[in-house]
Amino acid sequence: MFLITSRLASLVLCLAVGMLACMQVARAQSDDAVSIHGQVTYNWQKHDSFSDPRGAGTNSLTSSAGKMYTFTGTAFLGMRPWVDGELYFNPEVAQGVPFTGNLVGLGGFTNGEITRAAGTSPSLYRQRLFVRQTWNRGGGKETIEEGANQLSGSVDRNRVVLTAGNFSTLDVFDNNAYAKDPRTQFMNWGSWTYAAYDYAADSR
């Protein structure tokens, strides 16, 4: 069962206050100087009981009916601290419980968000913190649209971009429209962890 604990409520409130403060700063600056986005996702799943003639082993999915849930909330905050430079920070809060109470029993878990969760107590952590520097090299201009972890602006078609810090492999090397974000795309975590990478932890 999903419970809104006092600790979770406090974390969400602090996150909201921080975002509002950043929005006040954004109003005082140009449109492409600050970027603020947020996302909250709640995923609840269940399975009915099923026959298990051999009996459930230590690493098996229990045959009795079960349910699981995840809750995550993320702020996508960005700013332009200097010319052609960008700074991004993504604080995130997560909680959840998998089937059987641990991550066993399925070859590919049906909710990729469970990789972030650490039990019924919400955890606040730094999901991303990175800088991006662009060196324009001519060749005409093109417009970059504003979005989560992306400031709007005009850049040269020929450019060198350096990204450094804490971010996900999937942010750069697997930008597909189907299986890189369990919040909005296919949820099975095999699609973007061990089924796609030798070392699955690189995808977080």
Q: Where are the regions that the model predicts?
A:
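Bacterial N-terminal signal peptides
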Residues: 10-22
